[in-house]
Amino acid sequence: MARITVEDCLEVVNNRFELVMMASKRARQLANGVQPLIENAAASDKPTVMALREIAARRIDNALIDEVEKAERERAEREALEWAAAEVVADEDMSKNDD
């Protein structure tokens, strides 16, 4: 697979700082299990390399990254609420058994 360079990505994202932010957010998403958007992603590629490949291929933008982050936050909040609700039920069951 061809080597990806920062210059390839700068053709898509004009600002180096923005490129670093976009690539780091996407790499974190990929490391957490989000599926890559490029078909020929090598299993040996690290998340950072995959993120740069996606940027260079124009598969992602800030809107997509924000959308994925929002979905992950909502999922985490839902899981936290479910866990808290289960704890409340367990506490109620324990207090009933103490009576």
From Swiss-Prot:
EC number: 2.7.7.6
Enzyme class, first EC level, given as a word: transferase
Reactions catalysed, as given in the entry: RNA(n) + a ribonucleoside 5'-triphosphate = RNA(n+1) + diphosphate
Cysteine pairings via disulfide bonds: none
One Gene Ontology biological process: DNA-templated transcription
Keywords: DNA-directed RNA polymerase, Nucleotidyltransferase, Transcription, Transferase
Gene Ontology molecular functions: DNA binding; DNA-directed RNA polymerase activity
Signal peptide: none
InterPro entries per record: DNA-dir_RNA_pol_omega, Pol_omega/Rpo6/RPB6, RPB6/omega-like_sf
GO terms for cellular component: DNA-directed RNA polymerase complex
Assembly description: The RNAP catalytic core consists of 2 alpha, 1 beta, 1 beta' and 1 omega subunit. When a sigma factor is associated with the core the holoenzyme is formed, which can initiate transcription.
Purpose: Promotes RNA polymerase assembly. Latches the N- and C-terminal regions of the beta' subunit thereby facilitating its interaction with the beta and alpha subunits.
Entry-linked HAMAP family: RNApol_bact_RpoZ
Family of this protein: Belongs to the RNA polymerase subunit omega family.
Name used for this protein in its record: DNA-directed RNA polymerase subunit omega
Gene source species: Xanthomonas oryzae pv. oryzae (strain KACC10331 / KXO85)
